[in-house]
């Protein structure tokens, strides 16, 4: 089970007990915000994209109230944003849809955090299942996710 691999991953930091598991689904930003008890923007939304070349994928983690801006994505990564197909998600990220996170990923996974997260002291990414999360400060999140860099590839969702 992917949540167990993420718990094991956090053991190296002494944080395995901080992984929260909920009775209800936290697979979407809205559901995760309800489960955690925070505003939707503080949910760290993980999106996975195909790489330009080769196997593996790009994971971009954003605040819960933004969406990828295609022109910013293309400018940053030199290619169009093409999200992983459902059948490729588990193989390329190590996690099933709804539980994709930037922890315990297979080789070839490049993680980037969007600057939209930096508005918050603490954010809540998933932990490998559709009913899990962990509270992390942004500097911890960057370190634990082994992110390559902070990027600016999003825009606010129009209400």
Positions of predicted regions on the chain:
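Extended, low-hydrophobicity, polar/charged segments
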Residues: 1-159
């Amino acid at each position: 089970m992917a949540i167990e691999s993420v718990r094991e991953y956090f053991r190296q930091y002494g944080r395995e007990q901080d992984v929260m598991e909920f009775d209800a689904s936290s697979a979407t930003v809205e559901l995760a915000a309800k489960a955690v008890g925070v505003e939707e923007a503080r949910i760290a939304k993980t999106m996975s994209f195909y790489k330009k070349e080769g196997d593996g994928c790009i994971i971009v983690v954003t605040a819960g109230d933004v969406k990828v801006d295609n022109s910013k994505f293309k400018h940053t990564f030199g290619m169009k944003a093409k999200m992983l197909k459902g059948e490729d998600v588990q193989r390329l990220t190590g996690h099933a849809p709804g539980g994709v996170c930037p922890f315990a990923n297979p080789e070839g996974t490049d993680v980037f955090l969007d600057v939209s997260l930096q508005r918050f002291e603490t954010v809540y990414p998933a932990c490998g299942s559709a009913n899990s999360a962990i509270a992390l400060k942004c500097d911890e999140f960057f370190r634990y996710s082994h992110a390559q860099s902070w990027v600016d590839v999003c825009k606010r969702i129009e209400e």
